[in-house]
């Protein structure tokens, strides 16, 4: 499988030293949306939920034949992600980054082979962002304790 950025929830028991945001890998893109001083100007993000990658890799090992599968989730703008985070966590509104307006948003990936060969359909970007943000907020609280 050749996915784009991985986002979503952290692995159970995943520990990160306080403030070590580099350990978040590509989830840092989502974490950075939690800081008002950040100006987000990346128009779109191609992503896949980390859980879908894991499922795809396991199913791929069990599928006969050799396949090269490109797989990714629906694309979204980081401005949409900021707005969505504000809607599910209204207490964060004053804390969130600002995003440049953009209309550029189009997934260039065709997931039909993943659906056919692996019976795999990507999760929505909202589910991945919600689960990722929730875990990142829990992690952040553990840094303060």
Identify the function of each model-found stretch.
Residues 9-26, 59-68:
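Glycine/proline-rich active-site loop of Rossmann-fold NAD(P)-dependent oxidoreductases
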Residues 15-48:
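A conserved pocket-lining segment of Rossmann-fold NAD(P)-dependent short-chain dehydrogenase/reductase
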Residues 31-32, 64, 107-110:
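Mature, structured extracellular domains of secreted fungal proteins
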Residues 43-47, 54-101, 111, 125, ...:
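Mid/C-terminal beta-alpha module of Rossmann-like enzyme folds, strongest
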Residues 100-119:
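Conserved C-terminal active-site "lid" loop/helix of NAD(P)H-dependent oxidoreductases
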């Amino acid at each position: 499988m050749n996915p784009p950025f991985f986002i979503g929830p952290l692995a159970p028991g995943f520990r990160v030293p306080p403030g070590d945001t580099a350990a978040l890998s590509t989830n840092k893109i989502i974490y950075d949306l939690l800081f008002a001083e950040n100006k987000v100007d990346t128009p779109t993000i191609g992503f896949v939920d980390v859980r879908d990658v894991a499922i795809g890799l396991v199913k791929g090992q069990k599928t006969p034949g050799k396949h090269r599968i490109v797989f990714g989730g629906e694309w979204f703008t980081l401005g949409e992600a900021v707005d969505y985070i504000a809607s599910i966590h209204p207490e964060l509104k004053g804390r969130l980054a600002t995003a440049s307006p953009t209309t550029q948003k189009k997934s260039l990936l065709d997931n039909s082979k993943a659906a056919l060969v692996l019976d795999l359909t990507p999760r929505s970007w909202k589910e991945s962002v919600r689960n990722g943000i929730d875990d990142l907020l829990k992690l952040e609280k553990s840094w303060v304790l």
